From Swiss-Prot:
Disulfide bonds: none
Keywords: Cytoplasm, Glycosyltransferase, Purine salvage, Transferase
Pathway: Purine metabolism; AMP biosynthesis via salvage pathway; AMP from adenine: step 1/1
Domain of life the protein comes from: Eukaryota
Protein name as catalogued: Adenine phosphoribosyltransferase 4
Amino acid sequence: MSENEVKDPRIDGIKTKIRVVPDFPKKGIMFQDITTLLLDPKAFKDTIDLFVERYRDMNISVVAGIEARGFIFGSPIALAIGAKFVPLRKPKKLPGQIIFEEYELEYGSDRLEMHVEAVDSGDRALVVDDLIATGGTLCAAMNLLKRVGAEVIECACVIELPELKGRERLEGKPLYVLVEYR
């Protein structure tokens, strides 16, 4: 959400349902736990509805959800807007022919994989994850989709941790978030 947009009152309800767990999974991390959001049907529905309201008229043909929590939000968005859902998986989870994109983590590297035939050249893609921190995973997802000829329209996350500057790594691609934690 940009600063000049009017804040939807549902966002405050969503924010109150996200539990912050200090020192998980390691000391110094303030973990944003969305499982408490999922336990509240109204807050979960409001979350999906806000994304659907934004994307239903943008001619999105594919919603790419990043494993694992991007699946939770991406699938119902895709269904509601009439787009196909493509799971972007961690290594060795997909059978058949895959394409992959490696990306760097704070300590080491990882990769995202998708089926080769899942996305067509010219598809209009939305990338969905639960949270953006450093932006590495979203960048890998965008690169993967671009390599098969898709046009990435926007990235969408429930939560942004702005102090980690992930938005700056997205090469100017729009990012829509519901909740910022400072």
